[in-house]
From Swiss-Prot:
An MF annotation (GO) of this entry: zinc ion binding
The entry's keywords: Cytoplasm, Endonuclease, Hydrolase, Metal-binding, Nuclease, Ribosome biogenesis, rRNA processing, Zinc
Function: Single strand-specific metallo-endoribonuclease involved in late-stage 70S ribosome quality control and in maturation of the 3' terminus of the 16S rRNA.
Subcellular locations according to the entry: Cytoplasm
Residues annotated as binding Zn(2+): H122, H126, H132
UniProt protein name: Endoribonuclease YbeY
Record organism: Bacillus cereus (strain ATCC 10987 / NRS 248)
Record's keyword annotation contains Ion transport: no
Gene Ontology annotations for the cellular component aspect, listed alphabetically: cytoplasm
InterPro entries: MetalPrtase_cat_dom_sf_prd, YbeY, YbeY_CS
């Protein structure tokens, strides 16, 4: 299964190996979640100040976070679904703070690769509708994350 992923690096510090890691882990997740070929998403790498601005402007949270997901398939109030058109499935946008990912990798005592893969996967699952607002939803989402990370070889 192939995803079309548009990568945007606003930090100018993301190595090609990290882009490839994310492409591969999200490809594995898409395969395990049975996402159709040609589905699209974007992944943008930012600094803490930029992710803080996005949080403040769109989520009313004036602080940096590690990853933000904007799902295209979530219908907002007053929005209408476009049906019948032969268009690729647009999953949405992931925004990852590179400095925050580095901080958390150190904090949790694992590699930057593992943290970056985890954050990309976590955000991707949000794009697919997974959430962790209730205990039951959290158990389902975190269980699925663990399965995919282990299948990919990035388990703890």
């Amino acid at each position: 299964m192939s995803l079309l992923i548009d990568f945007i690096d606003e930090t100018e510090e993301v190595k090609e190996e990290y882009v490839n890691l994310i492409r591969e882990i999200l490809g594995k997740a898409a395969q395990m979640e049975k996402i159709e070929d040609g589905a699209e998403l974007s992944v943008t790498f930012v600094d803490n100040e930029r992710i803080r601005e996005i949080n403040r402007d769109y989520r009313d949270k004036d602080q940096p976070t590690d990853v933000i997901s904007f799902a295209m398939e979530e219908m907002g109030e007053g929005e209408m679904e476009i049906v019948g058109a032969e268009m690729p499935r647009m999953l949405g946008d992931l925004i990852i703070s590179i400095p925050r990912a580095k901080e958390q990798a150190e904090e949790y005592g694992h590699s930057f690769d593992r943290e970056l893969g985890f954050l990309a996967l976590h955000g991707f699952l949000h794009l697919l509708g997974y959430d962790h607002m209730t205990e039951e939803d959290e158990k389902e989402m975190f269980g699925r994350q663990k399965e995919i990370l282990e299948a990919f070889g990035l388990g703890r």
